[in-house]
Amino acid sequence: MKTIYLKNKVDVGEKLLGTFLDDSHYDILIQEDCDVYKPIPATDKNPNLEDYLLLKFRKGVFSSEMQETAYQSLREAAGESQNRGIAAGPRTEKSTGRDWVTLLQEKVLETLSGTMTTVTSDNPVDDMYVKYKYSTEAGSRGSVWLTQKRPKDFDFDIWAHSVKNLSPNERLEEVEKVYDWISDTSYANPVNSGIAGYFDRYPRIPYCRTTSYSTNHNDKFGAAVPFIERISNLFKELIPGRWKVQNTEVSKLDPSFRIGNSAYTTITVNKTYRTAAHRDAGDLKEGFGNLSVVSNGVPYTGAYLVFPEFRAAVDVQPGDVIMMDVHEVHGNTPIGGEGERISVVCYMREKMADCKTKAYEDARYNFVENRRLNNKHPLWHERWNGVSKGMWETQEWYKYLVCNGLHEYAAQIETAVYGAKSGVLDI
């Protein structure tokens, strides 16, 4: 087995984020079992090597039967997604069939509305045209034109030059009119990527839950669990310190939010997806990223996993596994050939630590759904999602917990709701 101790880190990550990587971004291509360590400062006389680990790569660690089961079980989890942000790569003006708001248009609108705080020129709109005239890149917000609302004869360039000399109030009025023709939703390039396992709360979906794929394909997902547990066992074998930290955190969760007996709550499944340069987010920082690849057996080329700041790349083939620091900038080289490459990324979602019991999280789900469907609710309105500010410290939620036998959780919010013990739980 090979061990590489890197001497330098090239600070180019921020410049590369969101761009595609290629063969020019690495000098070392790893195609054999290998451990790679980041530069270790000379001042660290007794380093804990796990603190400096960039990656551990092992080839051929899965049987062909296990790979085939994982492929058949997980490939459908990688549906078309627009939620991968910069990892989906750069957007051009007419890419993916969308009429993107270009970077030039975005900057001109910001300038005309007065939100471009760095403008110092007497002719800022003209300056934007000089700076971004030849850019075909979509704007950083990922917005698209609502072509059904935008007048067919609207020409952005003519409009921009016609309003630039209006008074500030008149310009703002014009800009607001144009903003009405632009989507409020941000989009990324569509890619084949999805999640399986379990997911934490966030504002619009305020309950921990089983992902859609694992709910709707429970048998298939269950068939993939031995493959995922095998990755976890390799994690334990190769990086025991990081595994122990992550496994301890996962063990604190309700078993219903753990994938088998693994150190993971969640997996991301990508299908023939060339990721642009990015850093992973949302995983347990003290843990480590674990990735494996399976395929349909048809050859493909490329898809090297590149760490541009370390000038290193790894050729992860079906049946291999890599443990990697996903918080370092990384991405893939182009993928060629007819083969279907399925990458499986296993991790613990950091905010899963906030999840309580399955019964409690299910109660949160049912509470939200009951509100959403109850058109007699005082807050109800068309397209309401059942969520409102402060809802988890209301008498409505407190009584719902009591009625559903979740007295322990009701007691935890009793004082916040009533200002004192209500006496309800004493009855």
Predicted features along the sequence, with ranges:
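Fe(II)/2-oxoglutarate oxygenase catalytic core
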Residues: 1-290, 314, 336-342, 348-427
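Contiguous, well-ordered alpha-helical segments that form the cores/surfaces of helical PPI scaffolds
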Residues: 286-295, 320-323
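Short His-Asn-centered micro-motif
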Residues: 294-295, 307-309, 324-326, 346-347
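A short beta-strand-loop-beta hairpin characteristic of the jelly-roll/cupin
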Residues: 295-317, 358
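Conserved metal-binding segment of the jelly-roll/cupin
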Residues: 314-329
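Short, Lys/Arg- and Gly-enriched loop/turn segments at beta-strand edges
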Residues: 330-336
